């Protein structure tokens, strides 16, 4: 009887707890397992890992809930989008370079948003570590190879999830509607489908962003044709594919360097995109967990 009563009591407590949540969100944990996180109140002490998270919260009007922006690796060289500059300037004093777990604990957050690698032993600690301390965690699904097929819809889900969590659903829906409107406008204004490669220069070869990457999905949503599915392409393979357009991925201040390098490779002179000067630089953070930059 005691066991039955205990089970019944625990079951009631679980139901009450679920009923107390104003929203429940699907995400993943440090073990890549799908989990549900519930919110009974709007987070007030948020650690936003990387600029794209801070920009998304600014766009939603929730930047005052941020207690720390964590710049990781190359983030320190990036600028916020111009429309968010005023709010971003107010975040400078609470911006950190590569927070440690100990520093994060001392900030007493109630919510942490980041990549999969944010929540490991080299980052801020595992999701389990934080969840046991009553801190919710959210991992962007297109970070660190979490999904086999990255899509624009994944980033729209991130924006909508943030809207639900911070009770800014109208604002998040407007952002997503604007993304879809921009896609339709671009499709209607462009000509024939282009043969496209999205490449990152790796020295003697290129990393290729194929249809399973967010960059590839973006091209295809705009009715472009991603013409290779290999993740690594040699010069010879690029010549054989002969794309009409190349989007060249760069990281921070190396935009002109990357352009100069690809145009100075003699072996590629016969490629249509090179001959016709149709190589367009695109910074990594616009195609990798871009948030509102998409």
Region spans (language model):
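Solvent-exposed, polar/charged alpha-helical surfaces in well-ordered, non-transmembrane soluble domains
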Residues: 44, 54-58, 102-106, 128, ...
């Amino acid at each position: 009887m005691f066991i039955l009563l205990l089970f019944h009591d625990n079951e009631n407590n679980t139901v009450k707890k679920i009923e107390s949540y104003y929203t429940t969100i699907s995400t993943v944990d440090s073990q890549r397992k799908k989990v549900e996180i519930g919110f009974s109140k709007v987070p007030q002490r948020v650690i936003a890992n990387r600029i794209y998270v801070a920009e998304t919260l600014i766009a939603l009007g929730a930047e005052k809930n941020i207690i720390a922006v964590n710049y990781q690796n190359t983030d320190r060289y990036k600028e916020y989008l111009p429309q968010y500059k005023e709010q971003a300037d107010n975040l400078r004093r609470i911006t950190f370079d590569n927070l440690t777990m100990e520093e994060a604990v001392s900030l007493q957050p109630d919510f942490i948003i980041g990549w999969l690698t944010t929540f490991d032993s080299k980052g801020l600690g595992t999701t389990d570590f934080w969840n046991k301390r009553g801190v919710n965690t959210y991992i962007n699904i297109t970070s660190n190879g979490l999904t086999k097929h990255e899509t624009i819809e994944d980033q729209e889900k991130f924006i909508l999830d943030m809207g639900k969590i911070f009770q800014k659903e109208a604002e998040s829906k407007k952002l997503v509607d604007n993304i879809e409107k921009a896609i339709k406008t671009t499709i209607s204004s462009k000509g024939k489908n282009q043969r496209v490669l999205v490449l990152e220069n790796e020295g003697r070869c290129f990393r290729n962003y194929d249809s399973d990457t967010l960059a590839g999905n973006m091209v295809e949503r705009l009715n472009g044709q991603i013409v290779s599915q290999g993740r690594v392409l040699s010069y010879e393979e690029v010549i054989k594919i002969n794309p009409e357009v190349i989007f060249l991925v760069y990281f921070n201040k190396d935009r002109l360097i990357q352009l100069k390098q690809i145009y100075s490779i003699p072996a590629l002179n016969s490629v249509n995109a090179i001959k016709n000067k149709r190589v367009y630089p695109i910074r990594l953070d616009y195609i990798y967990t871009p948030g509102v930059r998409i």
